[in-house]
A protein has these predicted regions:
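Class I SAM-dependent methyltransferase SAM/SAH-binding core
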Residues: 28, 33-79
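A short glycine-rich, Lys/Arg-flanked "PGG" loop and its adjoining helix->strand segment in the class I
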Residues: 105-117
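Conserved class I S-adenosyl-L-methionine
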Residues: 122-147
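Conserved alpha-helix/loop element of class I SAM-dependent methyltransferases that forms part
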Residues: 6-25
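Short alpha-helix
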Residues: 145-159
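Conserved Class I S-adenosyl-L-methionine
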Residues: 159-232
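A short acidic, Gly/Pro-enriched loop at the edge of an enzyme's catalytic core
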Residues: 78-89
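A short SAM/SAH-binding and catalytic strip from SAM-dependent methyltransferases
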Residues: 88-103
């Protein structure tokens, strides 16, 4: 960990803007959730599309972005609702590990299919260690699926060449435990059942591992950013 306060660390969006050329790019955010990254990409001059499998999350994204409701499509990473060679960039931000384990490699192939030659596959994945991970591990231990996501990238098609790899310290905040619980369940509604039995322990770890700061309680968690270019 650095000596910088968690809330002063560059955000994931800051990291992407520093590594990628976004202006004018047709960028696909796979697993876009409530659309925060889609809106950021547009602010950076990109032409973004969000793909999301959860109806409730699509509704949230469209409500937050009423002038661009058509920018959000229902779909999954392993079967993208997009034409061949139609995108300059495909981004999986904290989403590749949510693809079913036996279809992660297919999701990488789908990215290859929709990318133009010279297009980029961009993947941000949380590392399965650290204070933040320990909080969520009780309700949903993602150690294995996060490792499988990296393995799927390592087994990528030969058309992909890795051009950038960076592990960095990340942070995220919640106003309180109730917000954390809501967001975790919004991402995967099946987690509601787990909270019934382990919610008290999740809250204990949240208060133990979190750091009070601007806007609420902050948690630390390292991120691995990998970028690949489609060469053929």
């Amino acid at each position: 960990m650095t000596d910088v306060e968690l809330w002063d660390l560059p955000t994931n969006n800051d990291r992407l803007a520093g590594v990628l050329q976004l202006e004018g790019k047709r960028a696909i955010d796979v697993g876009c959730g409530a659309g925060g990254l889609v809106r950021f990409l547009r602010e950076q001059g990109a032409d973004p599309i969000g793909v999301e499998c959860g109806d409730a999350m699509i509704a949230q994204a469209q409500q937050a972005d009423p002038d661009h409701v058509d920018s959000y499509l229902a779909g999954v990473g392993q079967d993208l609702p997009l034409d061949d060679g139609s995108a300059d960039m495909v981004i999986f931000s904290y989403s590749l590990h949510h693809v079913p384990a036996d279809e992660m490699s297919k999701a990488v192939l789908e990215a290859e299919r929709v990318l133009k030659r010279g297009g980029e596959l961009v993947v941000l994945e949380p590392i399965a260690e650290g204070p933040g991970f320990e909080v969520f591990q009780t309700v949903d231990d993602e150690t294995e699926v996060r490792a499988l996501a990296q393995a799927a990238l390592d087994a990528r098609p030969s058309s992909f060449t890795e051009t950038h790899t960076e592990r960095y310290e990340g942070a995220y905040s919640f106003t309180d435990f109730d917000e954390l619980k809501k967001k975790v369940i919004d991402i995967d509604p099946t987690r509601a059942k787990a909270f019934e039995s382990v919610g008290d322990e999740v809250e204990r770890r949240f208060r133990q591992n979190g750091v009070s700061g601007p806007g609420g309680i902050w948690l630390q968690g390292d991120v691995l950013l990998r970028v690949f270019i489609k060469s053929i």
